[in-house]
Amino acid sequence: MARYLGPKCKLSRREGTDLFLKSGVKANDEKCKMNTAPGQHGARRARLSDYGLQLREKQKVRRMYGILEGQFKKYYVEASRRKGNTGATLLELLESRLDNVVYRMGFAATRAEARQLVVHKGIMVNGHTCNVPSAQVKAGDVVAVREKAKKQLRIQNAVELAKHRKELSWIDVNTDSLEGTMKSSPDRSELSADINEQLIIELYSK
């Protein structure tokens, strides 16, 4: 299955909420009509069944993190094997992805941009270059922008944009040296309240 390369607004409108797929330079609601589905005339949203709600929630989270179906299912399987709340563990695994951590630290304006930065070998983890977006970052790991990439305008712009986002307690970022430390596992209370991970668990556990 190929990665979606079409309009980002279309995905957000499909899910009826901002998936944070765009840089945030302009508010998404200026262009994306979240209260209507995609299409020339904005089709009315049908009332969903329980299964439909579960499926939509899964699609929303999968698209938010830019992950294909097969890989997303693997995250669920891994989360279900671990002790504790499966839904919270699933989100922890997603948030601990290297591309997401790069985005959370403010080195990229979007997760897609963060993924590209990682793939192009612009990021180091504990002093070593890592070009695997799905690599799991652990507490104590240091994530930094490589010296040769620090002058990229998109990174400088991303750092400025990140100043307007809420700071997260589980990461510590030095914007001068463009490096950050993952202090602890991601805290569910600081993640989007618009995510209902229990619906995803119900979908996969059938």
Swiss-Prot record:
Q: What Pfam families would the database entry show? A: Ribosomal_S4, S4
Q: Which GO terms describe its molecular function?
A: rRNA binding; structural constituent of ribosome
Whichever gene encodes this chain, its name is rpsD
SUPFAM superfamilies cross-referenced by the UniProt entry: Alpha-L RNA-binding motif
- Give the organism the record lists: Francisella tularensis subsp. holarctica (strain LVS)
Q: What does this protein do?
A: One of the primary rRNA binding proteins, it binds directly to 16S rRNA where it nucleates assembly of the body of the 30S subunit.
Return the SMART domains for the record. Ribosomal_S4, S4
Belongs to which family? Answer: Belongs to the universal ribosomal protein uS4 family.
Output the Gene Ontology cellular-component terms: small ribosomal subunit
Keyword Ribosomal protein part of the UniProt annotation: yes
How the protein assembles, per its UniProt entry?
Part of the 30S ribosomal subunit. Contacts protein S5. The interaction surface between S4 and S5 is involved in control of translational fidelity.
Q: Which GO terms describe its biological process?
A: ribosomal small subunit biogenesis; translation
CDD domains according to UniProt = S4
S4 RNA-binding domain sequence ranges:
96-158
> What is this protein's name?
Small ribosomal subunit protein uS4
- Which keywords annotate this record? Ribonucleoprotein, Ribosomal protein, RNA-binding, rRNA-binding
